[in-house]
Amino acid sequence: MCHAVALAEFDPFEARRQANILRTSDYTATNGQSPAYEWNLSDPNPPIGAWASLRIHQIQKKNEGKSDIYNLSSAFRKLLLDYGWWANRTDSKKESMFDGGFLGLDNIAIFDRSKPLSDGSTIEQPDGTSWMAMYRC
């Protein structure tokens, strides 16, 4: 959904349409999980849809002096499901941390982050926890 935020500066209607497409049953699971990225749609990603929807709303209001509050409110149910799915996941070590959800600058790694490394070690990714902390602000 981050791509829709970038699009909002030029075409807020299309930005909302793009964000709404990702919230349809074609992409979002019934439990609220939203798609991750094209090479693995079922990977866990933090619930960034709420942030994206709010930013699109804010950008349109700043640029056009008006915004589509109906679109924002109609997205709320799906966004709440996505947040609930993420908040209720169990981390791999059962330490009540938000596990996974890598959303780095380029989202590219030289190895498969979902599997242990050849020496058996794993990589801890703080991305999910940092995204969830944003909801407390």
PLM features: what roles do these ranges have?
Residues 9-12, 22, 27-30, 44, ...:
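Active-site acid/base region of carbohydrate-active enzymes
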